[in-house]
Amino acid sequence: MQTLKCVVVGDGAVGKTCLLISYTTNQFPADYVPTVFDNYAVTVMIGDEPYTLGLFDTAGQEDYDRLRPLSYPSTDVFLVCFSVISPPSFENVKEKWFPEVHHHCPGVPCLVVGTQIDLRDDKVIIEKLQRQRLRPITSEQGSRLARELKAVKYVECSALTQRGLKNVFDEAIVAALEPPVIKKSKKCAIL
């Protein structure tokens, strides 16, 4: 059985762990516990072929900037996450996460993933953002950023409601199995 390695990166508290736990167990975790490093595995059928999808959760906090890349070797696809209710996490996709991933793993396909879409229309959240002269990130902004960064595509989901959740991983699998022709088909390696 072929294994595909999917590494999830993004700022702390954007919902990376919830995304993985909700997808692998169909349950939403109750507590926030910052991740250092964790991994999950699921078996998925693609056509008639079973694949093991190895899902690697990483720490978004700056304290782990030197450790995090140790999880990158042999990655087949990256999910670069931000929360649609955290404009700073959206900016960091471009300013921090894409540069980091491409530095360590040039040519490995990346998807930009907007998380927490169930909160995009939450009145309390919107008011809180408006007090800071901010607003939730739209699907159009996510798609535009993905095009600008030459990501495979933009997808979004809610780990709480599971809306769009399966699609995130379906798209990641497709990207890992059929990397775009313009990119190198090599897996990530740290020298």
From Swiss-Prot:
Binding locations of GTP: 10-17, 57-61, 115-118
Sample GO molecular function, one term: GTPase activity
Propeptide position ranges: 189-191
Domain of life according to the entry: Eukaryota
Protein name: Cell division control protein 42
First-tier enzyme category under EC: hydrolase
Function comment: Involved in development of cell polarity during the cell division cycle, and essential for bud emergence. Affects signaling in the pheromone-response pathway through the STE20 protein kinase. Negatively regulated by the GTPase-activating proteins RGA1, BEM3, and BEM4.
Lipid-modified residues, S-geranylgeranyl cysteine kind: 188
Gene Ontology CC: one annotated term: nuclear membrane
Motif extent (Effector region): 32-40
Similarity annotation: Belongs to the small GTPase superfamily. Rho family. CDC42 subfamily.
Localization per Swiss-Prot or TrEMBL: Cell membrane
UniProt catalytic activity: GTP + H2O = GDP + phosphate + H(+)
Cysteine methyl ester sites (modified residues): 188
Broad class of the protein's primary localization: membrane
Effect upon mutating residue 61 to L: Enhances interaction with RGA1
Gene this chain is encoded by: CDC42
Keyword Hydrolase: yes
Assembly and interaction partners: Interacts with BEM4; the interaction is direct. Interacts with AXL2. Interacts with RGA1.
